[in-house]
Amino acid sequence: MNKGIIYLIQPAELVGTNRYKIGMSNNPDLERCKKGYKKGSRYLCIMECIKPHDLENKIKEIFNNKFKLIAGNEYFEGDDQVMLKLFLEIIKQHNNTNNDNI
């Protein structure tokens, strides 16, 4: 089964704004987060998941309908607590759909 991580972060250059980034890695360790973002980044949530690419696409699709897309296809503007709650709900639904043992 394809395991990896999914995350919601505020890169260091966006701290002090209400802008956040969704990301994923097919590698289930934290190397992507450790090496991919500058010191001072805020990590709102990092979770292990199955089918991380599918989950990231699902989150981006739902976030596109709820928040303002500000850059690329994975940077969004909005309230961090609202985003985090929705992010966790989508992950829970995804995990329940794909693996009852998680």
Task: Locate each region found by the language model.
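Non-catalytic accessory segments flanking enzymatic or RNA/DNA-binding domains
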Residues: M1-I102
